[in-house]
C-alpha cells in the first residue's frame, strides 16, 4: 500500500516537470531521470520492507497456538493426570489387600481356636467323673487326681497297700482288718513331714469310702473313729503283753 502511493506520487512529479517545460533541455532531462530513478528505488525498497513484514507476520501467526489446539492440550493434560491418579489408587488398593487378608486370617484363626477350646471343655464336662476304683473292672487307678498324689513319693507303696486292703476288705465295718497297714502308712507319713505334713488317718478312711462308692454313705465320724481306735488297741495289746 505504501509502495503504490509512493510510486503514484513520483509519476505525478515527473509529469509536471515535463509539462511545465517546453523544450527538452539536457539539464532538465537529467533531473527527470534522477527523479524517476530515485522514485523507483524508493518503491522497490518499500516493497521489500512490506514483504519482509508480511513474512514475519505470517511466521508469527503460524507459531501462535489456536484456541482449539490449546483446548486439546488441556484435555490431554487432564487425561494424563486422571490416569496417574487412577494408577496410584489401584496401587494403594493392591498394597492394602495383603494387610486386610492377614488381619482376616488372624481373626478366623482366633475364632477357630476359641471354638475348639470350648468344644474340649464341653466334652470334658459331659464325661462322667471316674473315681480311683472301678467296681466294674475291679481295678484301681493310681494316677487318679482324686488320690492327691499319695500313690507316689516315699510312702507310695505303704499307701497302695492300705488303700488296696480297704478296697477289697469284706470285714464289718469295712477296712477294720486293714488297721495295721494304716498304721504303717501313717508312720511313714510322719517320717516325711516336709511332703505329707499332718495327715489325718480318719480323713483318709473317709476319703477311701468316698472313692469306693459315692452312693454309699460314709459312716458317722464318731462311730468310725471309735472302731479305728478300738482296732488299734486290739492290735497293740498283744505286742505289749509279757
From Swiss-Prot:
Record InterPro entries = CHCH, CHCHD4
Annotated transmembrane regions: 35-51
**Pfam families xrefs:** CHCH (PF06747)
Q: Give the Basic and acidic residues compositional bias ranges.
A: 76-90, 224-235
Transit peptide region? 1-18
The record places the following residue ranges in the Mitochondrial matrix compartment, namely 19-34
Disulfide partners: 144-146, 155-188, 165-178
Q: Which UniProt keywords apply?
A: Disulfide bond, Membrane, Mitochondrion, Mitochondrion inner membrane, Oxidoreductase, Protein transport, Redox-active center, Signal-anchor, Transit peptide, Translocation, Transmembrane, Transmembrane helix, Transport
Cofactor annotation remark: Cu(2+) or Zn(2+).
Q: According to the lineage, what is the superkingdom?
A: Eukaryota
- A Gene Ontology MF term for this entry? protein-disulfide reductase activity
Motif, Cx9C motif 2: chain positions: 178-188
Mitochondrial intermembrane domain ranges by topology: 52-242
Q: Which GO terms describe its cellular component?
A: mitochondrial inner membrane; mitochondrial intermembrane space
List the residue ranges of the region (Disordered). 1-30, 58-111, 215-242
Q: According to the UniProt entry, which residue ranges have a biased composition of type Polar residues?
A: 1-22, 59-68, 93-105
Task: Give start-end ranges for motif Cx9C motif 1.
Answer: 155-165
Instruction: Write down the membrane topology.
Output: Single-pass type II membrane protein
GO BP: protein import into mitochondrial intermembrane space
The listed locations are: Mitochondrion inner membrane
| Annotated ranges, domain CHCH | 152-196
Task: Name the needed cofactors.
Answer: Cu(2+); Zn(2+)
Q: What exactly does this protein do?
A: Required for the import and folding of small cysteine-containing proteins (small Tim) in the mitochondrial intermembrane space (IMS). Forms a redox cycle with ERV1 that involves a disulfide relay system. Precursor proteins to be imported into the IMS are translocated in their reduced form into the mitochondria. The oxidized form of MIA40 forms a transient intermolecular disulfide bridge with the reduced precursor protein, resulting in oxidation of the precursor protein that now contains an intramolecular disulfide bond and is able to undergo folding in the IMS.
Q: What is known of its domains?
A: The CHCH domain contains a conserved twin Cys-X(9)-Cys motif which is required for import and stability of MIA40 in mitochondria.
Q: By what name is this protein known?
A: Mitochondrial intermembrane space import and assembly protein 40
Q: Which organism is it from?
A: Cryptococcus neoformans var. neoformans serotype D (strain B-3501A)
Q: Which gene is transcribed and translated to give this protein? A: MIA40
Amino acid at each position: 500500500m505504501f509502495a503504490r502511493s509512493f510510486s503514484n506520487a513520483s509519476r505525478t512529479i515527473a509529469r509536471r516537470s515535463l509539462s511545465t517545460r517546453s523544450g527538452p533541455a539536457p539539464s532538465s532531462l537529467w533531473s527527470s531521470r534522477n527523479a524517476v530513478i530515485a522514485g523507483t528505488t524508493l518503491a522497490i525498497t518499500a516493497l521489500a520492507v512490506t514483504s519482509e513484514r508480511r513474512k514475519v507476520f505470517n511466521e508469527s501467526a503460524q507459531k501462535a497456538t489456536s484456541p482449539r489446539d490449546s483446548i486439546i492440550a488441556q484435555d490431554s493434560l487432564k487425561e494424563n493426570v486422571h490416569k496417574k491418579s487412577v494408577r496410584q489408587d489401584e496401587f494403594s488398593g493392591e498394597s492394602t489387600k495383603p494387610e486386610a487378608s492377614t488381619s482376616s486370617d488372624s481373626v478366623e484363626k482366633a475364632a477357630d481356636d476359641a471354638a475348639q477350646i470350648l468344644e474340649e471343655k464341653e466334652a470334658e464336662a459331659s464325661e462322667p467323673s471316674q473315681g480311683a476304683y472301678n467296681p466294674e473292672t475291679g481295678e484301681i487307678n493310681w494316677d487318679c487326681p482324686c488320690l492327691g498324689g499319695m500313690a507316689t513319693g516315699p510312702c507310695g507303696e505303704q499307701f497302695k497297700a492300705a488303700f488296696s486292703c480297704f478296697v477289697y476288705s469284706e470285714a464289718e465295718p469295712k477296712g477294720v482288718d486293714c488297721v495295721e497297714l494304716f498304721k504303717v502308712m501313717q508312720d511313714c507319713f510322719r517320717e516325711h513331714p516336709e511332703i505329707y505334713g499332718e495327715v489325718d488317718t480318719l480323713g483318709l478312711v473317709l476319703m477311701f469310702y468316698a472313692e469306693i462308692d459315692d452312693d454309699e454313705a460314709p459312716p458317722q465320724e464318731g462311730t468310725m473313729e471309735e472302731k479305728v481306735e478300738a482296732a488299734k488297741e486290739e492290735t497293740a495289746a498283744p505286742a505289749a503283753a509279757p
